[in-house]
């Protein structure tokens, strides 16, 4: 493509608006990424290059630079970094305030909502918290947006990312101007009968209408069909689907069906418009009333980013129709993006915002070009094939970035459901609108839901079919930001080349960029032994990587609390997925206490584990019973550890287990599996929850020089002694601990270890030890820069 052609593209109104909005977004992204200097330098360099090649003028370059810094400044001044609730956390107290979001949960006895706190006890405060409340279903159903409530609960700060690849819940909640979480497990709340301001009364009434419609549907549809229809009509921000349905739709690539989007908005407006046309209402009143209906529908859905985007675009298009002005598609999309970010810059971190705009941009550009180029193919075939295909190309990198997965059959699943979904959506919208009219609500829903019930069952069957096919989901490593940029630049270039009918250059571009992307994934393989101590609070989980790239876990952290996720799922498995690690040589479960074995089921279900090493065959706890049950279901190979037994060898490296039987009230801890890892001159001893008594039984089989000691039982009492540290001559002590009620680590234990370098996960976050067998380096995880930073370099004794 020559310079003149590029210049023509850059003068296009759509391109001008798109580039301007892109630099505005870059300014916002620079603030959130905390790489403002780097991004500013790269952005200004791009403008300088465009100027140097005379592709843009000086005035436009200065204006775009201004837009970039305006985006950064806006974000800096608009985004809060704290509120008045933060100094109070942690605190158990009674809170007074207003529910400011639609209460929502996938479980009938639990609800989540944002809560504007006005009082803590008798103290006046101002702040917003995310509430999770558990209570009987009849109490949960009474909660509604706009209500003033009194609630007793525990105010906490959300967890931050203290491990590589870990989801940062604190950072996520900051996008909503929220810096604390409030848990109420006993349903100790009271709804107050206070007069609502007009704004909240209106939103409350609107949500009552939505709930009334869903309640009418519930007479004729049962779970999961009810939640699926509710998600299609009102979006998953307002109606949460069951977890197993969500998992099925993720595997099949159909999850977007459950999110309100442009299709929903278009259906609502079209239905309203043609009803009024049938009633012979004039054109302008039809359009204006339709715009009001769209606004009401958007408020009813819970205000998800995708439905806001679709609604704003349609509203601007309709406003243009009223004044005889046509909107340029990409310009309008760019303008809406800027408008949303002006209102809330944190939208840029919202996955729904990113997916919605990326898919829409792809459909307006790539799909539009393909439809024009293949003009001999019937439009209905092009719509069925090109739309899901192009959408998949544009969203796949984002899915890989956030979820480490690619749905292989997504395009086929979407093609299979296009017609079906159109019928379900139309009938769902029509019946829901008519259900607002009380006298005909039951009759309407009974007729429409009778048919929809069969169609929804077929939809679930299609999702399960594609979601259960072999290799339906492929795990991917975590792409870097620059790789995403290269990929999307390639898509834009390919779209432009196809538009110009330059197919040979299209193929060359695809091959060249694919090669570049492949090269960026290549990295030198470390030949060192590496041990990672994950920060799993007052629990244990260690990942060992041998010089021959074999992976072992020693313990797997805690099990899920209530309906949450295990530490293995949110920390360790995410780490493995980001690095494309799919095979684990062995998992050593030192004993069946929940804080050591709670994540085992998730590990063996999601990774290919060659051998599961268990401490004993006694299903003494619920966690143990779950492990044996899951192992049987998936045919997991199990070995029971023996005392002084080598379980793995490779050149210069051995891994040995020790197991002694000790009775008494602390038998489980004292009898837990001890592991010795040796590589050349380097040794590390993992004591699990065992202490001095256990050590004295096995010390005759241990070396006198152990460089690193993983201290037993989170640094509790009686886990080390002076004679033990003298015997091992330990230089480094690792204590895996966090907030607890047991006094871990014990002061006496820390006194004994004071002559060693103490590495506490509650202070240093995740810790990594890397060694070539002679020199070992110690790193701690920096949650600001999101990487390990070196702390010490030491020499192993010969």
Where do the model's predicted regions map?
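Non-globular, low-confidence helical/coil segments that flank catalytic cores
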Residues: 138-154, 172, 178, 195, ...
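Hydrophobic alpha-helical transmembrane segments in multi-pass membrane proteins
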Residues: 15, 19, 56-65, 182, ...
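Residue-level signal for inorganic ion chemistry
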Residues: 27, 97, 352, 395, ...
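N-terminal leader/targeting segments
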Residues: 1-90, 205, 309, 357, ...
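Membrane-interface helix/helix-cap signal primarily in integral membrane proteins
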Residues: 2-10, 68-256, 570-577, 583, ...
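Short hydrophobic helices that act as membrane-entry/anchoring signals
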Residues: 200, 204-218, 226, 379, ...
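Hydrophobic alpha-helical segments
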Residues: 1-33, 320, 430-465
């Amino acid at each position: 493509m020559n310079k003149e052609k590029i210049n023509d593209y850059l003068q296009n109104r759509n391109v001008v608006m798109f580039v301007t909005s892109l630099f505005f977004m870059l300014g916002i992204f620079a603030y959130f990424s905390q790489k403002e200097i780097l991004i500013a330098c790269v952005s200004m360099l791009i403008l300088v290059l465009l100027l140097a090649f005379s592709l843009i003028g000086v005035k436009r370059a200065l204006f775009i630079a201004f837009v970039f810094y305006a985006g950064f400044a806006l974000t800096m001044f608009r985004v809060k970094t704290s509120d008045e609730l933060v100094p109070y956390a942690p605190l158990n107290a009674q809170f007074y305030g207003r529910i400011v979001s639609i209460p929502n949960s996938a479980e009938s006895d639990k609800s989540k909502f944002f809560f504007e706190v006005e009082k803590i006890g008798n103290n006046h405060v101002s702040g917003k918290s995310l509430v999770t409340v558990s209570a009987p279903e009849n109490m949960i159903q009474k909660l509604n947006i706009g209500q003033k409530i009194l609630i007793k609960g525990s105010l906490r700060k959300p967890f931050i990312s203290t491990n590589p690849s870990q989801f940062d819940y604190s950072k996520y909640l900051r996008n909503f101007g929220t810096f604390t979480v409030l848990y109420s497990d006993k349903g100790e709340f009271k709804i107050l009968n206070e007069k609502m301001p007009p704004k909240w009364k209106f939103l409350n009434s609107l949500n009552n209408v939505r709930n009334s419609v869903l309640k009418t549907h519930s007479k004729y549809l049962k779970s999961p069909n009810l939640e699926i229809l509710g998600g299609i009509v009102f979006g998953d921000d307002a109606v949460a689907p069951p977890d197993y349905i969500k998992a099925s739709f993720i595997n099949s690539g159909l999850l977007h069906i459950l999110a309100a989007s442009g299709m929903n908005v278009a259906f609502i407006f079209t239905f309203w418009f043609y009803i009024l046309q049938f009633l012979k209402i004039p054109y302008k009143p039809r359009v204006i009333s339709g715009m009001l209906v769209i606004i009401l529908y958007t408020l009813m859905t819970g205000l998800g980013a995708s439905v806001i985007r679709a609604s704003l675009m349609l509203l601007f298009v309709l406003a243009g129709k009223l004044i005889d002005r046509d909107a340029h598609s990409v310009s309008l999309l760019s303008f809406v993006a800027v408008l949303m970010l002006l209102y809330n810059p944190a939208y840029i971190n919202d996955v729904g915002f990113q997916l919605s705009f990326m898919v829409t941009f792809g459909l307006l550009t790539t799909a539009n070009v393909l439809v024009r180029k293949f003009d001999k193919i019937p439009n209905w075939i092009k719509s069925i094939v090109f739309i899901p295909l192009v959408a998949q190309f544009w969203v796949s990198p984002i899915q890989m970035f956030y979820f480490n997965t690619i749905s292989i059959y997504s395009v086929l699943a979407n093609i299979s459901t296009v017609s079906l979904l159109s019928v379900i959506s139309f009938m769902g919208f029509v019946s829901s609108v008519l259900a607002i009219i009380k006298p005909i609500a039951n009759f309407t829903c009974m007729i429409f839901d009778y048919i929809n019930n069969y169609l929804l069952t077929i939809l679930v069957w299609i999702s399960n079919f594609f979601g259960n096919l072999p290799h339906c989901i492929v795990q991917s490593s975590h792409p870097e930001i620059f790789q995403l940029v290269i990929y999307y630049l390639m898509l834009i270039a390919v779209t432009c080349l196809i538009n110009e009918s330059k197919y040979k250059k299209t193929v060359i571009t695809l091959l060249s960029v694919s090669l570049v992307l492949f090269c960026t994934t290549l990295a030198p393989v470390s030949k060192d032994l590496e041990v990672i101590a994950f920060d799993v609070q007052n629990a244990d989980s260690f990942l060992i990587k041998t010089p021959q790239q074999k992976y072992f876990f020693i313990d797997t952290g805690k099990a899920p609390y209530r309906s949450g996720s295990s530490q293995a799922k949110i920390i360790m498995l995410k780490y493995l997925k980001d690095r494309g690690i799919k095979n684990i040589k062995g998992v050593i479960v030192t004993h069946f206490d929940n804080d050591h074995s709670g994540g085992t089921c998730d590990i063996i279900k999601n990774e290919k584990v060659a051998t599961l090493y268990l401490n004993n065959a006694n299903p003494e706890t619920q966690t143990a019973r779950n492990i044996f049950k899951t192992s049987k279901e998936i045919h997991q190979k199990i070995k029971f550890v023996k005392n002084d037994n080598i379980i793995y060898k490779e050149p210069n490296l051995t891994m040995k287990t020790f197991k002694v039987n000790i009775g008494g009230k602390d038998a489980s801890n004292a009898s837990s599996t001890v592991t010795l890892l040796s590589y050349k001159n380097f040794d590390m001893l993992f004591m699990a929850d065992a202490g001095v008594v256990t050590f004295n039984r096995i010390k005759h089989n241990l070396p006198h020089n152990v460089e690193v000691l993983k201290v037993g039982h989170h640094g509790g009492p009686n886990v080390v002694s002076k004679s033990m540290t003298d015997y091992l001559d330990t230089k480094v002590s690792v204590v895996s601990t966090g907030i607890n009620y047991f006094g871990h680590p014990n002061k006496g234990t820390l006194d004994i270890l004071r002559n060693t370098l103490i590495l506490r996960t509650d202070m240093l976050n995740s810790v990594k030890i890397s060694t070539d067998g002679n020199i070992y380096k110690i790193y701690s995880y920096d949650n600001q820069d999101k990487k390990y930073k070196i702390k010490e370099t030491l020499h192993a004794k010969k």
